[in-house]
Amino acid sequence: ALTLKRKIDASNKERTDMVEYIDSYFLQKYSGVAVKDSAKINSESPAWAIDRLSILALKIYHMNEEATRAEASQEHRDNCQAKLNVLLEQRTDLSTAIDDLLQDIENGDKFMKVYKQMKMYNDDELNPVLYQNKK
């Protein structure tokens, strides 16, 4: 179980590193924008929103598989289709929100910061379970 957890942690770190890399790209791209005095920060960076969009794409794929699975009952397929419809609406809304955020940043109406994630659970020096096991 610990080996699997470490693999999941490593995969999550790769994903987090990629999100931070994408945010660094956006930060560089919009570095010359004159930020308005009234500009506000968004609660989520563009790359973290894109990360959510990628997770949503996986949910849509798998829900569509269930909604069209021939051997499933009609009730199951109908329930999954209803869920799929919600996921598709979420994708539309999130895509629009990302487009709006990037436009707002480009116009100086919003600004962004890149925060490095500080995960403690996978750090031998910060996680009590890990540093106690080293003794």
Residue ranges and their predicted role:
Residues 1-135:
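Anionic, Ser/Thr-rich low-complexity intrinsically disordered regions
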